[in-house]
From Swiss-Prot:
Enzyme class, broadest EC rank: transferase
Stated family: Belongs to the RNA polymerase beta chain family.
Gene: rpoB
The UniProt record lists the keyword DNA damage: no
One Pfam family per UniProt: RNA_pol_Rpb2_1
Protein name from the UniProt record: DNA-directed RNA polymerase subunit beta
Length: 1363
């Protein structure tokens, strides 16, 4: 068992029975891979070019209107972003990269006589095309200094879909089938039946036209259409017998059970007598017996349909029977009278082939391709006179031109698989064959030979990730650019122009910026804690442009579908109107190149599980039988059970191992990251698990994070992939460390052109998007060896590289004086005094000094009419000190604004404008601390416009930043020198000096100690008489100089950025941001929750001495209501409590053993045997036994708080395991114990369930919600107080509250509340007067809302007058 750097500090015992064959893929790779494909330029890519390359190729080459010039696209590149992510967040900038394109302008000379073109000139130039937002390493975008996430969108895949109206269109309830071809870009094509079974088509939901018209427009004639879709029989009239002769076809007898009399044409014998029963098998036997031609009576032709046109006279209207005419006695008589002895009949019957297309052809008045195209044109462009040329061009552009129509490679793949076509996925327009195949399918559907598609199947829904969404947006910008380029090409002198002159970069930049700022899918990142970040990046939304809307989405779309298995989590989705529309990707899910979600499976051959892992999409999966991960398997991989529960074609079945094709990779591949963090998920009701996984995202990072004693084993994956921790990028040794940075010397680096040192700057007390605190703490010591990928610093809500959202607290499930009624929570005062649930929140205050009409605002300490006490926290520049304790109303930044002096006359104004005298009067517009909050100033940032003189504070901040960068530079140079000297030692060790250097005499033997004492420049002067060694030293000198120069350049670049002015909004001269840290202790009214959806509100904080306590006197921390468990069916919390209790007791035992050993954390026989009994032999021998002295000491220190365990979802500890753990911890296996009442000292009547539960404090803090209204604003119309904390609103006294007072008969109180306390304007004034005068009488008048009601009734033309 290989332990990582952080795992050695806190080893988890796992209850998982199944070996992990596939580690969880990087949790944010969905975002990163998608955007990488957009921005990576691969010039060697032989296949379809990706990303921006594809975008530019979609419009280039651009030709001018006279064919004199073309602008061609060659390649593109993205420059390095100007500022790094940290600088962008600080300065409020967007993290973008400049997009440069190499374009070639080719100008032609046209020879009018010979009609030829010769190239006159070709100019190539790199042109700036705009700014492209770049993705940070953690999968986010920074727009205007704010971190945003682009959510993946689930939408209907392009392709062809068959469906029916579920019998709703017509009163008869008949199923009307329809089909829709959805392209990625272009017009939609629909085909549908009506009640009379005619087949129609529509383009873009316009008026419907007969489907035969579409086929004729493709170039088929009516008879070719009949031949394509129907087989035919030829009937010829035999005058001798008066019967019709035709070939004997057994197929015709499929639909009939008994038939008319049939005579063998050759012998004249009756082979089938009238009334004989005959079916397909009998008919087949007759054919094999030699029956070839038969004679049938005229009755058997009636009801059949003509396959070809039959002309019986020269009359235009009446003389022709068209294709699809249904035969009857009259028609047959007319045909015979016209001396037509042979006719062709389409083979139709009620089972195999209905005559739907034939009747459609018959009713279609169009007869030629031109007629058909003209009719389509009339529908597309009603009111415009049609000409055949224009109509043909428009029809061809609809579906058959790659400029206007694009199925996309996905659409082509889907269409090929649905219609069984063989066609390259490079062909992304419709072909005639596709439309013909679709009509065939429509006929099959009506005949019951095929089934409609399930639109909620994940094979028919695909995901658009960031890359694709941004690419589509870029395409919009580029199309706008194309129009502008074409205009410029005609107006400019093209021969002297350069590519630069034709390009305006604005449209692309604006288009991309719009998307990131205002699109529904570009969202403000949820940064409450690391889990909420990861979940946000893995979210899949069905809403957004081109998706569904909440109102239209029905139940089916929101429901869990069998294909969600292993792709989309069935548990994690919001409660409320978005339920089921916003989902989360499952743990192992990936998105393939076509945008379909795939899930991994292990191959099974002949009942033996292979190591090979394959990813399957929902379409592929339906072909196979797939077993679940917990099927019993022996060491060799053989499946042991005779019948295994499997999934096959969306159903659950029991299958024989030999028939199984695949097996799940892990039981947790079913659920999302958040759901797989819930231990004993399998014992919780789904609704409560949903609440649990949603509430974990709302947990605020606490002051002292603590990872759960009962975890699921993926806490470390979340902490690692979320990007809040610091991960070592290379192997190395920790060289220097303090609270703000870690310096690691890379051990493997021998190339001095790369830096040999990694400096990791830690984030200290930074503000997150949700005002929670981001703070990183080092986990390493000087001298520690770290490997690439090790976590070297914890971030918010992480402890030792594991996710730590809450706290392990001792819980008792029992009622306590009604204080835990209705899910309320009773908490011990210890949790407040020891800062167990204390969190730090950081609020940003911002003030701007603008240039106004009356003069410039000024940030200063010199504020009129403010006493010195109020300015005690401000420095000489008028800005608050870092570290100052501030409370509500305190000045953070002093600012004065010129006051408009309305009294001054025109003379004064003139003089003032001439002599530039300052505005005489100023008002105090200082930035003050908001009401109801107090805290400590943790950071101040000052931004100055370019060219504005900096104040003292700005210069101080600037110096401090330059000092930090200087320190980094010094450290890098030190480590570089050390590395160079070590390399020099490898070359020169043991050699003797041939020439004196400084204090070293000739002949001195060189070693590392001596080389380290010499100045680095003298090292390069060493001569030892060996040409090769001296050449190596010279090479080393070059490498050193190059590396030192790189360090110097980086330093100068950073200093330049620090010193340069800031880009501020127009008219803003200076901006100051103040960050205040507010400490939030637990208070009654705060919302708390466990991981199982067991949420509640703190009702009372009880002194420790009053809490229930155990036999040894230890009080519990939290008391929950036992009635909250049975009806909610989240029993997982009880199992967690039992197991947590055992873990805690193990910690107590470790503490006891350490105390026995004089409080030394050493490996003694007792500690070793105890740990072996808990962890088991395998884990102890494979991991813990191998730890060195320091590592073992660290482990023991951490284990004193409890031995952590992991119980993976669906593969965790069973009831038996929990009992065994309790036994091992010498605790009652019932999990219950006697408690004593802290107030009386008496024992409670019966044992109580006690243990350790993991509780979270949620981001619904009472301090943010509680408020009181004194006097405040009123609504203008109703004259009632506004609502809500932001408006300083009042408390709503609604309809039901009125009923309550009516029920009590409290009429005076009620009258007061509805009038003078609310919207009786005159009454309010009178009440105020009586209070001022000290009187006690007042009367109520008419409430304003009554007047509003009267006005509304008057607006309905009903006059009301009051007497």
């Amino acid at each position: 068992m290989q332990l990582s750097f952080t795992q050695k500090k806190n080893v988890r015992k796992s209850f998982g029975k199944l070996a992990e064959t596939l580690s969880i893929p990087n949790l944010i790779e969905v975002q990163k891979n998608s955007y990488k494909q957009l921005t990576d330029f691969d010039s060697e890519a032989g296949d379809l070019s990706k990303g921006f390359d594809r975008v530019f190729k979609s419009i280039f080459p651009i030709e001018d209107l006279n064919d004199k010039a073309t602008l061609e696209y060659v390649s593109y590149r993205l420059e390095k972003p100007k500022f790094d992510t940290e600088e962008c967040i600080q300065r409020g900038l967007s993290f973008t990269s400049a997009l440069k394109c190499t374009l070639r302008l080719v100008v032609y000379e046209i020879d009018q006589e010979n009609n030829t073109k010769d190239i006159l000139s070709a100019k190539e130039q790199e042109v700036y095309m705009g700014e492209v937002p770049m993705m940070t390493d953690s999968g986010t975008f920074i727009t205007n200094g704010v971190q945003r996430v682009v959510v993946n969108q689930m939408h209907r895949s392009p392709g062809v879909f068959f469906d029916h109206d579920k019998g709703k269109s017509h009163a008869s309830g008949k199923l009307l089938f329809n089909c829709r071809v959805i392209p990625n870009r272009g017009s939609w094509l629909d085909l549908e039946y009506d009640v009379k079974d005619f087949l129609y088509f529509k383009i873009d939901r316009k008026k419907k036209i007969f489907a035969s018209t579409l086929l004729m427009a493709l170039g088929l004639t009516k008879s070719e259409i009949a031949d394509e879709f129907y087989d035919k029989d030829t009937y010829s009239f035999d005058a001798k017998t008066g019967k019709w002769k035709t070939k004997f076809n057994p197929e015709n007898y499929k639909a009939k059970n008994f038939s008319e009399e049939v005579t063998d044409a050759k012998t004249g014998n009756v082979v089938i007598k009238l009334g004989d029963k005959i079916n397909f098998l009998t008919a087949k036997k007759l054919a094999s017996d030699g029956l070839k031609d038969i004679l049938v009576s005229q009755e058997s032709l009636i009801g059949k349909y003509l396959h070809n046109e039959v002309k019986v006279s020269d009359d235009e209207e009446e003389g022709t029977f068209g294709i699809g005419t249904e035969l009857n006695d009259t028609i047959i008589k007319q045909i015979l009278e016209a001396n037509i002895s042979s006719i062709e009949i389409s083979i139709t019957n009620s089972i195999n082939k209905g005559p739907y297309l034939l009747t459609t052809i018959l009713n279609d008045k169009n007869n030629s391709k031109n007629d058909a195209i003209t009719e389509i044109y009339k529908v597309l462009r009603p009111g415009e006179p049609p000409t055949v040329e224009i109509a043909t061009q428009i029809f061809n552009n609809l579906f058959f031109s790659s400029d206007r129509y694009d199925l996309s490679d996905v659409g082509r793949v889907k269409m090929n698989s649905r219609l069984n076509l063989e066609c390259s996925d490079k062909i992304t327009i419709l072909r005639n064959d596709d439309i013909i195949a679709i009509v065939h399918k429509m006929l099959d559907l009506r005949d019951g030979k095929d089934e409609v598609d399930d639109i909620d199947h994940l094979g028919n829904r695909r995901v658009r990730s960031v890359g694709e969404l941004v690419e589509n947006q870029a395409r919009i910008g580029v199309y706008r650019m194309e129009r502008a380029i074409k205009e410029k090409m005609t107006t400019l002198d093209i021969e002297s122009a350069m590519p630069q002159d034709l390009i305006n970069a604005k449209p692309l930049t604006v288009s991309l910026k719009d998307f990131f700022v205002s699109s529904q899918l570009s969202q403000f990142m949820d940064q409450t804690n690391p889990l909420s970040e990861i979940t946000h990046k893995r979210r899949v939304s069905a809403l957004g442009p081109g998706g569904l809307t909440r109102e239209r989405a029905g139940f089916e779309v929101r429901d869990v579908h069998p294909t969600h298995y292993g792709r989309i989590c069935p548990i994690e989705t919001p409660e409320g109107p978005n339920i089921g529309l916003i989902n989360s990707l499952s743990t192992y899910a990936k998105i393939n190149k076509y945008g379909f979600i795939e899930s991994p499976y292990k191959k099974v051959l002949n009942g033996i599980v292979q190591d090979k892992v394959e990813y399957l999409s929902a379409m592929e999966e339906t072909k196979y039988t797939i077993a679940q991960a917990n099927a019993k398997i022996d060491k060799s991989g053989k499946i042991l059970e005779e019948l295994v529960p499997c999934r096959e074609n969306l159903n659950f079945v029991l299958s024989n191992p030999s028939k199984i094709d695949y097996i799940d990779v892990s039981p947790k591949q079913l659920v999302s990251v958040a759901a797989s963090l819930i231990p004993f998920l399998e014992n919780d009701d789904a609704n409560r698990a949903l609440m649990g996984s949603n509430m974990m995202r709302q947990a605020v990072p606490l002051l002292k994070p603590e990872s759960p004693l009962v975890g699921t084993g993926i806490e470390s994956d979340v902490a690692l992939d979320s990007g809040v921790t610091i991960v070592a990028s290379r192997d190395g040794t920790v060289d220097k460390i303090d609270g703000k940075r870690i310096v690691i010397k890379a051990t493997e680096e021998t190339d001095f052109t790369k830096s040999g040192v990694d400096i990791y700057n830690l984030q200290k007390f930074k503000r997150s998007n949700q005002n929670t605190c981001i703070n990183q703490k080092p986990l390493v010591r000087v001298g520690d060896k770290v490997k690439s990928g090790d976590i070297i610093a914890d971030g918010p809500s992480t402890k030792l590289g594991e996710l730590a959202l809450g706290k392990n607290v001792t819980v008792a499930f029992m009622p306590w004086q009604g204080y835990n009624f209705e899910d309320s929570i009773l908490i011990s005062e210890r949790c407040v005094t020891d800062d167990v649930f204390t969190s730090v929140h950081i609020v940003e205050y911002e003030v701007m000094a603008r240039d106004t009409k009356l003069g410039e605002e000024e940030i200063t300490r010199d504020i009129p009419n403010v006493n010195e006490e109020a300015l005690k926290n401000l420095d000489e520049s008028g800005i608050v000190y870092i570290g100052a304790e501030v409370k509500a109303g305190d000045i953070l930044v002093g600012k004065v604004t010129p006051k408009g002096d309305s009294a001054s006359g025109p003379e004064e104004k003139l003089l003032r404008s001439i002599f530039g005298e300052k505005a005489i009067d100023v008002t105090d517009t200082s930035l003050k601390m908001s009401r109801g909050s107090s805290g400590t100033v943790v950071d101040v940032r000052v931004f100055n416009r370019h060219g504005i003189e900096k104040d003292e504070r700005s210069i101080t901040i600037e110096r401090a930043e330059i000092d930090t960068v200087q320190q980094d530079k010094i450290v890098e140079e030190e480590i570089l020198e050390r590395s160079i000297k070590q390399r020099a030692n490898q070359i020169l060790s043991g050699a003797s000096l041939t020439k004196k250097i400084k204090d070293l005499d000739e002949g001195t033997k060189l070693d590392l100690e001596i080389i380290n004492k010499i100045n680095i420049n003298d090292v390069f002067k060493i001569t030892v008489g060996n040409v090769n060694d001296e050449a190596s030293i010279a090479q080393l000198k070059d490498q050193y100089n190059q590396a030192k120069q790189d360090i110097q350049e980086r330093f100068e670049d950073k200093v330049l950025k620090i010193r340069s002015g800031d880009d501020l909004l127009p008219s803003v001269m200076k901006m100051v941001k103040v960050f205040v840290a507010i400490k939030r202790r637990l208070r009654p009214g705060d919302k708390m929750s466990g991981r199982h959806g067991n949420k509640g509100v703190v009702s009372k904080i009880v002194p420790v001495e009053d809490m229930p306590y155990r036999e040894d006197g230890r009080p519990v921390d939290i008391v929950l209501n036992p009635l909250g468990v049975p009806s909610r069916m989240n029993v997982g919390q009880i199992l967690e409590t039992h197991l947590g209790w055992a873990c805690k007791e193990f910690g107590e035992e470790v503490k006891r053993l350490v105390n026995e050993n004089n409080k030394k954390f050493e490996k003694t026989e007792k500690i070793s045997s105890f740990l072996k009994s808990v962890y088991g032999k395998e884990v102890f021998d494979g991991g813990i036994e191998k730890l060195n002295k320091t590592e073992f000491s660290d482990l023991c220190e951490n284990l004193q708080n409890g031995i952590a365990i992991s119980t993976p979802v669906f593969d965790g500890a069973k009831e038996k395991d929990v009992s065994e753990m309790l036994e091992l911890a010498k605790l009652p296996t019932s999990g219950q114990t006697n408690l004593w009442d802290g107030r009386t000292g008496e024992m409670f009547d019966r044992p109580v369930t006690v243990g350790i539960i993991y509780m979270l404090k949620l981001h619904h803090l009472v301090e943010d919600k509680i408020h009181a209204r004194s006097t405040g604003p009123y609504s203008l119309v109703t004259q009632q107080p506004l609502g809500g904390k932001a408006q300083l609103g009042g408390q709503r006294f609604g309809e039901m509250e009125v009923w309550a007072l009516e029920a009590y008969g409290a009429s005076y109180t009620l009258q007061e509340i509805l009038t003078v306390k609310s919207d009786d304007v005159a009454g309010r004034v009178k009440v105020y007067e009586t209070i001022v005068k000290g009187e006690e009488n007042f009367e109520s008048g008419i409430p304003e809302s009554f007047n509003v009601l009267v006005k509304e009734i008057k607006s309905l033309a009903l006059n009301i007058e009051l007497n």
